[in-house]
Regions:
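Acidic/polar, solvent-exposed loop/turn segments
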Residues: 1-256
Length: 256
């Protein structure tokens, strides 16, 4: 079988290549000589042998074009172009099949087939990062935004969608799933570990998520949130009565 790749489609992971094309040949014959061949039928469409070159035939997922025909040998060359992504089914090989018959004006030949095997494209979940400074209330984001292949394409089977978070349990704050890959992280600024951070010191929270493409292929990545310590304002307490108060003792005063 000829093989094409969904990754070669416009949104595919290798869109700059030519993976969506396949090339091959088929041969017509007649015991009485090739001059007797009148027409060829491909996928139910009959074309006169003299008009075969340049003819295009539609398949389930792409098109087959006859690019040459040698009337001496009976060999025809074709190009197949995958034009859309398929719906992938587990344990099933996706194919586009073309049936062919030759006719000499009185009878059809036995049926032959051209089978194009279609290789599925996959999504690419990319690790995410976000940051929040001590004293800040919250940060938000969406982990699907950067889930692209190296060529900045999402993969042929679009749209991609969010599946789930492995866990939303947080150590230094509260993590909320806001839907469709979105999240909100609220920092607990009263947490002892957060308050204990020196200026520039960090803590990290990591969350794992799963996304999928339109035909169900899944991929997993992580979101890492970095908490950065800031310089806390010092406090000062004045207590005039600390040494034993008498008349004229002043009220206790505190400076932030």
């Amino acid at each position: 079988n000829d093989v094409v790749y969904e990754s070669g489609l416009a949104a595919g992971s290798a869109a700059a290549g030519n993976g969506e094309f396949a090339y091959g040949t088929f041969t017509v014959s007649d015991a009485d000589g090739l001059d007797d061949i009148d027409s060829v039928t491909i996928n139910g469409t009959t074309t006169a042998i003299g008009s075969l070159v340049g003819s295009t035939f539609s398949g389930a997922s792409g098109t087959l074009t006859v690019t040459s025909y040698d009337s001496v040998t009976g060999i025809a060359e074709y190009t197949y172009e995958l034009t859309k992504a398929t719906t992938d089914v587990d344990l099933v090989t996706e194919t586009d099949v073309f049936t062919l018959m030759a006719n000499d004006g009185t009878a059809d030949s036995a049926q032959a087939k051209i089978t194009i095997e279609i290789t599925d494209d996959i999504p690419n979940a990319v690790d995410d990062t976000n940051s929040i400074a001590e004293g800040t209330a919250s940060v938000t984001g969406n982990v699907l935004t950067n889930d692209l292949h190296a060529n900045t394409q999402p993969g042929a089977d679009t749209p991609t969608s969010f599946v789930s978070w492995a866990s939303t349990s947080a150590t230094y704050g509260t993590f909320t799933n806001t839907g469709s890959g979105g999240y909100k992280y609220e920092l607990d600024n009263k947490n002892a570990d957060v308050q204990g951070l020196d200026d520039g010191e960090t803590l990290e929270e990591t969350f794992t998520y799963t996304m999928k493409d339109a035909d169900g292929d899944e991929d997993t990545a992580t979101l890492k949130i970095t908490i950065t310590g800031t310089n806390d304002v010092p406090g000062l307490t004045v207590d005039p009565d600390a040494g034993g108060g008498g008349e004229g003792a002043h009220d206790r005063q505190e400076c932030p």
